[in-house]
Amino acid sequence: MQLQVLEHIIMKIILEENEMTEYLPEGSLIDTQKNKEALSGIETLKKAQENKTILEAKATVCTAKHDLIVDLGTIRGIIPKNEGAIGIETGETRDIALISRVGKPVCFIITDFEKDKNGRLTAICSRKAVQEECTANYLEKLLPGDIIPAVVTHMENFGC
């Protein structure tokens, strides 16, 4: 159940006035001014890496190796398969969790920059790191009886 929740709640916002951290669904950050500014150039992307800022961009392709390619505007970003979601390496999360993100916004942090064989700069990103942060700072602190803000997005027909 926890992994299903993580697929939708992995975006962090720090509310300036009271320093409270809130985690919202992917897609909530992509059109914000702060996100657009961070994606505006190489220097702002490097600053986001240094600060471990959670960014959001559209996943454009899932490669044959199940790496996600994200459009960072000025350069390309790659989320390697093992950094795409918690549980991918162990098989607890299936590859469809990555494939289904194509064409949709995904949250990530930039962990490194590399030049490809053609000399083009590529950002190496991690979606899993954001999920782990959400788990450590939010989900693991929930207690039975806690009331959390949520939106029902669809119903699933399954039972015990």
Where on the chain are the PLM-derived regions?
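Single-stranded RNA-binding regions, centering on S1/OB-family and related RNA-binding modules
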Residues: 3-160
